[in-house]
Each structure stands twice: as structure tokens, then as C-alpha cells.
């Protein structure tokens, strides 16, 4: 018996389980699970939420999961009585075992599992500003699946791993931003022998990120009134919204749709600009507190995309300055006792701004998604190694595609994969 189907929320038609597009509209395909009430599984890491993940098996090794706990320190500092933090990262005494220190693992593991289930043999192509690349390198190293990473040159410091054997990973840098890395990746993924991971259209990525909301609600036993997250493309917000829809249908956790509070880093905040109509000018992404949050082409207007999620939840987008993020990060780390990545500091600052603007009340139930943390802690306890750069390119190089194809073929020939 099938576990799930994939439907188009635009036309309502059932599509292939691996579909990324509907032939009739621009909607993001969405999973519909036959099991309407989720039961946590006795499985490792994120597979605890196996019921609502679009997979029919698991990757046993290497998966962590979101961990939700009631905040004391940060909540007290902000005078919030019901702030719950969902932490994604490395924090052993708090059951945090995500070894990439980023919630991007929640996307990479189910995506990889689906490739394996589909007997996919093509090289997986991933464009990333760093954290997604690290997550896919982690799971590719565990499974031995061939992976081509295309990342901006300035993001290579994020390409580290705790795995020893990274021979299935080929890393290419582009002297440009994330958008230029995406453009290059799209060209390569269109070639024979390569497959794209699908981005926001990949239901495995979205449902994987949706486990943040699942963990929060199954831990607190109720849907929150407010959900905070820093976003680049906004896909994490879509994921939280879709998970909340399923939890409302589950029937055991209330029927209130959590209000989405999404945060972007000024001055490079396309979603914020689109949503508010305010134009922001700056040197992007160089002037950002965290350039992983810069995405020039977010899925805003697609059916089932960011705008629909905001409209359905009465959501809001905040523009956060570097100074606001830095101050919020210090307050969080001092009061919670764990280091966090720059991106979730944007979300911490958004909570502080929401309080100032009266968008939330001190006694309301709030979930804060800490999308990455514990890297300093991990580096103290575990050995890490940088991924080697196999090829460095200029986006203006007319022969760039051929050079990438040759490099991948060379690594394959030499047994790199």
C-alpha cells in the first residue's frame, strides 16, 4: 500500500511521486499522507517522523533531528512566558546530534533516501551558499552517492565535514554569488548523467524541514500561536505552514494555524522588499550578516509558495540589520549556553522586533527555529576536515560547463566516486 501521493495544490491532480512541476500551472507539488495522525517512530534521528516523510526506508547512519525545549534564559531576558526553542545542531546534553550543525540535514537525508529508492544513478547536482552543500556532502559521504557541489567562492569556509571519506563529492567554486552558482548548476543538471535536487519544489526537502514544526508540536502537545524563522528563499516558512496543515488535520493539537514570522537580513532581503514594497539598496551579498540568506529568486508567487503561506497564516516578514542580529546573537548565546550560526540570530532579532512592534504578546505560545548551532561545541569535541576544491571557475568562462564535465569524468575514472 502506498504511504503517500504527490498532488498539485493548484489543479488538484495527483502527480508522479518524484514530480517537481505540474504541467498545468506553477504550483509547488505537495505530499498527501494516508496516515492522518502521526506516531513518532522508534527510529534514529529525523526518521522519528517517518510517517510524514516521503520515503519508504531510511539511511541508518548520521541523521540528527530537531530538539524542542522550553527556553528559560532567552525567554526570561525577553520576558516571554511560553517561548519554545527548536534547536538544530550539535548539543549532546540536549540530544542535539546534527553533525553539520545546520537544519539543512533535514532536507538532505530524505532527498538522498528518495534517490536511492528510485534507483537513481545520475550525479546529484547541488548549488549552495554553504550550509546546504555541507549537508549534502555529509549524506553523500555516508552513502557514497556521487555529488557535484557548485558553490560561491566566498562560501568555501562552510564546506567542512566530520566524515573521513569524501571521495564521492566533487566541489566546484564560482567566483560570484549564490544566484550565479545556481545558474551554473542548472546548466549542468540539464546534461545527461546529472540530476538536480529540486530546490523548493522537492517535497522531500520541504517535508524534511517540516519536522521542525512536527517536533515542536509533538513536544509541547499543541500548535504554537507564532513561529519564527530566518529565511532566504522562504522555503522553510512554506514547510512549517504545510506541516501545520497536517497537524491541524491530525486533530489532537488544536486547530489554530500558527502565524509565520519570517526574517530576512537587510539590505539583501528580496522577500522583505517584495512583501513590504520597500526597496533596499546595498552591496549584496557582501554586506550581509549571513549570506546564506540571500536568494534572488525565491518562490514567492508560485501557488503554494511564500505569498500563499503568509496570506494563510496572517504572516509577516521582518527586515533585520547586521547590528540587530549581532546584538540578538550575543543575548541568545549568553542566556541559552550554546553558540548559534549567524542565520538564526536574524530570527532571534525578529522576536525582539516583534515584541517592540506589538506583533506578539508576552504570554503567547511561540516557537523559535534555531536553524543552526553548536559548531564551536562540535569543533571542540570532534575532528573536522575541509572539503577540497576540485575546480575553480569564473561565471564568465564560456568553457565552464565542459571543464566541470571533464572534472567529474576524471574523478569517476579515477575511482573518486
UniProtKB/Swiss-Prot annotation:
Pyridoxal 5'-phosphate binds at residues 131, 371. Its EC number is 2.5.1.76. Keywords: Coenzyme M biosynthesis, Pyridoxal phosphate, Transferase. It comes from the Archaea. Gene3D superfamilies: 3.40.50.1100. Its cofactor is pyridoxal 5'-phosphate. InterPro entries: Cysteate_synthase, TrpB-like_PALP, TrpB-like_PALP_sf. GO terms for molecular function: ATP binding; cysteate synthase activity; L-serine ammonia-lyase activity; magnesium ion binding; pyridoxal phosphate binding; serine racemase activity; threonine racemase activity. Pathway: Cofactor biosynthesis; coenzyme M biosynthesis. It catalyses: O-phospho-L-serine + sulfite + H(+) = L-cysteate + phosphate. The modification N6-(pyridoxal phosphate)lysine is found at residue 104. GO terms for biological process: coenzyme M biosynthetic process; D-serine biosynthetic process. Specifically catalyzes the beta-elimination of phosphate from L-phosphoserine and the beta-addition of sulfite to the dehydroalanine intermediate to produce L-cysteate. PANTHER family: SERINE / THREONINE RACEMASE FAMILY MEMBER, SERINE RACEMASE. Belongs to the threonine synthase family. Cysteate synthase subfamily. Homotrimer. This is Cysteate synthase.
Amino acid at each position: 500500500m502506498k504511504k503517500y501521493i504527490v498532488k498539485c495544490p493548484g489543479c488538484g491532480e495527483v502527480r508522479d511521486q518524484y514530480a517537481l512541476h505540474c504541467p498545468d500551472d506553477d504550483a509547488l507539488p505537495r505530499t498527501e499522507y494516508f496516515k492522518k495522525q502521526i506516531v513518532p517512530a522508534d527510529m534514529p534521528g529525523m526518521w522519528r517522523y517517518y510517517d510524514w516523510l516521503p520515503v519508504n526506508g531510511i539511511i541508518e547512519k548520521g541523521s540528527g533531528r530537531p530538539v524542542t525545549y522550553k527556553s528559560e534564559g532567552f525567554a526570561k531576558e525577553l520576558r516571554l512566558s511560553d517561548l519554545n526553542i527548536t534547536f538544530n545542531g550539535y548539543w549532546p546534553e540536549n540530544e542535539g546530534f546534527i553533525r553539520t550543525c545546520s537544519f539543512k540535514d533535514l532536507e538532505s537525508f530524505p532527498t538522498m533516501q528518495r534517490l536511492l529508492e528510485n534507483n537513481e544513478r545520475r550525479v546529484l547536482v547541488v548549488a549552495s551558499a554553504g550550509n546546504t552543500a555541507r549537508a549534502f556532502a555529509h549524506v553523500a559521504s555516508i552513502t557514497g552517492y556521487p555529488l557535484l557541489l557548485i558553490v560561491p567562492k566566498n562560501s568555501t569556509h562552510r564546506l567542512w565535514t566530520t566524515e573521513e571519506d569524501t571521495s564521492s563529492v566533487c566541489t566546484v567554486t564560482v567566483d560570484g554569488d549564490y544566484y550565479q552558482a545556481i545558474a551554473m548548476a542548472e546548466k549542468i543538471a540539464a546534461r545527461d548523467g546529472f540530476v538536480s535536487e529540486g530546490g523548493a519544489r522537492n517535497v522531500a526537502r520541504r517535508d524534511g524541514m517540516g519536522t521542525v514544526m512536527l517536533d515542536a508540536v509533538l513536544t509541547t502537545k499543541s500548535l504554537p500561536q507564532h513561529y519564527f524563522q530566518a529565511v532566504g528563499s522562504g522555503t522553510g516558512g512554506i514547510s512549517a505552514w504545510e506541516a501545520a496543515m497536517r497537524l491541524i488535520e491530525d486533530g489532537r493539537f488544536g486547530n489554530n494555524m500558527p502565524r509565520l514570522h519570517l526574517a530576512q537580513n537587510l539590505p539583501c532581503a528580496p522577500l522583505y522588499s517584495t512583501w513590504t514594497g520597500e526597496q533596499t539598496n546595498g552591496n549584496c551579498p557582501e554586506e550581509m550578516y549571513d549570506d546564506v540568506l540571500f536568494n534572488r529568486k525565491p518562490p514567492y508567487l508560485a501557488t503554494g509558495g511564500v505569498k500563499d503561506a503568509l496570506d494563510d497564516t496572517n504572516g509577516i516578514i521582518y527586515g533585520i540589520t547586521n547590528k540587530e542580529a549581532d546584538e540578538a546573537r550575543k543575548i541568545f548565546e549568553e542566556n541559552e549556553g550554546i553558540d548559534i550560526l549567524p542565520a538564526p540570530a536574524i530570527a532571534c532579532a525578529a522576536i525582539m522586533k516583534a515584541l517592540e512592534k506589538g506583533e506578539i504578546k508576552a504570554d503567547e505560545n511561540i516557537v523559535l527555529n534555531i536553524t543552526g548551532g553548536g559548531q564551536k561545541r562540535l569543533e571542540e569535541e570532534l575532528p573536522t576536515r575541509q572539503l577540497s576544491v576540485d575546480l575553480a571557475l569564473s561565471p564568465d568562462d564560456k568553457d565552464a560547463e565542459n571543464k566541470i564535465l571533464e572534472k567529474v569524468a576524471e574523478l569517476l575514472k579515477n575511482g573518486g566516486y
